[in-house]
């Protein structure tokens, strides 16, 4: 049984992200291996015409040229961003009208660093102050080619250090897409999350290479690899992620999600949530399979994070608590960890440091039918002697949480778990 990438596997995966369309298939189901989507993905129709986007060069805005090519080749065509060319985007692009179209990105698309413009004009999505440079949506849309999208993030990292309330755009916004393939692509220096998948279904992300760190003392914060939100039947696979926040995060109303074959470094793990942030709103995450993950230098491996039933503040720009909903039928299977603080973390006290208050006002979200299987590796030692924590705010809101074949130890050889308000007989771990 394989738990992690070998060196050869990592090299092969990196090579698959080179500027080519090799591996792209219009039969999306054939691309999903070894596990298949929860529901068959619709095939993509052939394309019969090609449009090349003209680059103005010299940092001039190419947005009009991009939109012209998209309209011209919509409904059955392919739009090409040519190799060895840089396309500058200084205008928010609404591309939710797309239908039966491919975008082949061979060159580089770079977004301007005009922070005043983007704060005023980026697309606002409501949840957690999310904004995007563009909205890509419609029906049967494929984006591939191995080229680069560059968010010019450094100016945003420095600005956020001065003002935590600024609106930082997400690099890649998939909004309202019904049927699509994204990748291979390289994503670099996103101001905030790298990808938001909202109100979308039947989309596969395959061969995404994510990387981008700050060159100043100000960290690149909140740089999640993917955030799924109000989306169904999404596949994320065969990708390399070097970032500073969640490798993948399943935000509210994410259902039927498959994540497999990822190499995550420097992240906060693969996370359910956070959920329950908005009082009175119902958040559901259901039917999720996370399979064959390598997790390095992270705060968490597998993580479920839920806000308590009382108002809390994680940071100046992230506050909430009191929401409703459920987490159900989530499986993490085959995860290798190295230098990770918590191999497994389940918390219903996200954003609240006062544990007494958290227990007095337990979470309104239920967590049930959760499976952690076949973990191995070594933690960072930060939580010694503990390697994992499975803590519910009340025994009434957690049920059927299982852990089996967990072979994880701290650098000192300990393997303790914190287990609170859960059925310990279902946990094949050392509940200290």
UniProtKB/Swiss-Prot annotation:
Q: What is its EC number?
A: 3.2.1.67
GO CC aspect terms:
extracellular region
**Which positions make up the signal peptide?**
1-23
Positions of glycan attachment:
113, 129, 199, 253, 265, 292, 297, 329, 354, 364
Q: What pairs make up the disulfide bonds?
A: 247-264, 392-398
Per UniProt, the enzyme's principal EC class comes to: hydrolase
Cell location: Secreted
An example of a Gene Ontology BP annotation on this entry? cell wall organization
Sorted alphabetically, which keywords does the UniProt record give?
A: Cell wall biogenesis/degradation, Disulfide bond, Glycoprotein, Glycosidase, Hydrolase, Repeat, Secreted, Signal
The family note in this entry says:
Belongs to the glycosyl hydrolase 28 family.
| Protein name (record) | Probable exopolygalacturonase X
The gene it comes from is: pgaX
């Amino acid at each position: 049984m394989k738990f992690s990438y070998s060196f050869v596997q990592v090299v092969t995966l990196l090579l698959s992200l080179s500027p080519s369309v090799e591996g792209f298939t219009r039969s999306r189901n054939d691309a999903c291996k070894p596990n298949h989507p929860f529901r068959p993905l619709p095939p993509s129709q052939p394309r019969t015409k090609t449009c090349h986007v003209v680059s103005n060069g010299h940092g001039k805005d190419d947005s009009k040229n991009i939109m012209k090519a998209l309209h011209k080749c919509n409904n059955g065509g392919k739009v090409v961003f040519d190799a060895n060319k840089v396309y500058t985007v200084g205008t928010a692009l609404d591309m939710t009208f797309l239908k039966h179209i491919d975008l082949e990105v061979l060159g580089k698309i770079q977004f301007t660093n005009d922070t005043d413009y983007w704060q005023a004009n980026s697309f606002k999505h409501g949840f957690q102050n999310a904004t995007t440079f563009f909205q890509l949506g419609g029906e049967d849309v494929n984006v591939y080619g191995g080229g680069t999208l560059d968010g010019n993030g450094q100016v945003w990292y420095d600005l956020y250090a001065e003002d935590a309330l600024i609106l930082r755009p997400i690099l890649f916004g998939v909004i309202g897409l019904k049927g699509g393939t994204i990748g291979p692509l390289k994503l670099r220096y996103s101001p905030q999350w790298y990808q938001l998948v909202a109100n979308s279904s039947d989309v596969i992300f395959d061969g995404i290479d994510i990387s981008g760190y700050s060159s100043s003392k100000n960290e690149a914060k909140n740089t999640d690899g993917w955030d799924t939100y109000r989306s169904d039947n999404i596949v994320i696979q065969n990708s390399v992620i070097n970032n500073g926040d969640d490798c993948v995060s399943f935000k509210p109303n994410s259902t039927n999600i498959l994540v497999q074959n990822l190499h995550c470094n420097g992240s906060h793990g693969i996370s359910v949530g956070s959920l329950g942030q908005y009082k009175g709103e119902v958040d559901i995450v259901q039917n999720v399979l996370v399979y064959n993950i390598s997790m390095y230098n992270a705060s968490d491996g597998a993580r479920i994070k839920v806000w308590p039933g009382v108002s809390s503040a994680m940071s100046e720009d992230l506050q909430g608590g009191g929401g409703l909903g459920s987490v159900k039928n989530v499986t993490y299977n085959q995860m290798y960890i190295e230098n990770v603080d918590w191999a497994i973390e389940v918390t219903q006290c996200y954003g609240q440091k006062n544990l007494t208050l958290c227990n007095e006002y337990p979470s309104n979200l239920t967590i049930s039918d959760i499976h952690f299987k076949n973990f191995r590796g070594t933690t960072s030692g930060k939580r010694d002697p503990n390697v994992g924590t499975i803590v519910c705010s009340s025994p009434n809101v957690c049920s059927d949480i299982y852990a089996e074949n967990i072979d994880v130890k701290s650098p000192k050889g300990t393997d303790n778990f914190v287990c609170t308000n859960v059925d310990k007989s279902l946990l094949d771990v050392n509940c200290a």
